[in-house]
Amino acid sequence: MDTPNKDDSIIRFSVSLQQNLLDELDNRIIKNGYSSRSELVRDMIREKLVEDNWVEDNPNDGSKIAVLVVIYDHHQRELNQRMIDIQHASGTHVLCTTHIHMDEHNCLETIILQGNSLEIQRLQLEIGGLRGVKFAKLTKASSFEYNE
């Protein structure tokens, strides 16, 4: 019979919060359909670990993955070409792009990137700063190991 690894077991601990923070936490649980406070707290911890992994690890190791979501006015002259030029000039690998037409004026592009964290963030800032770009959000990902 296998004995459970202590790292795999769920540990109960308590947290002290001000009432307004607890109320906000409970509102998010309901709004996002979590089954418990624990589920939301686990997700928040995982998100923070990914964020910290991006900051703490060697930023030049080239192993970071991110998704850049861009919404832009496709009528803006030469914007598509400038976005492509920035991607090609970057030291970041563009693994995949997806382009959709949201409406008569707006397009949404997702760009999956791999590279070092500084280059990926620089690419996001450059594209986000272009005239006609309405939204440029970078979602960071990490494949660090943790036990669930």
Curated annotation (Swiss-Prot):
InterPro entries: Acetolactate_synth/TF_NikR_C, ACT-like_dom_sf, Arc_rbn_hlx_hlx, CopG, CopG/NikR_regulator, Ni_resp_reg_NikR, Ribbon_hlx_hlx, TF_NikR_Ni-bd_C. Ni(2+) binds at H88, H99, H101, C107. Keywords: DNA-binding, Metal-binding, Nickel, Transcription, Transcription regulation. The keyword Transcription applies. Binds 1 nickel ion per subunit. Transmembrane segments: none annotated. The keyword Methyltransferase does not apply. Transcriptional regulator. This is Putative nickel-responsive regulator. It comes from Helicobacter pylori (strain J99 / ATCC 700824).
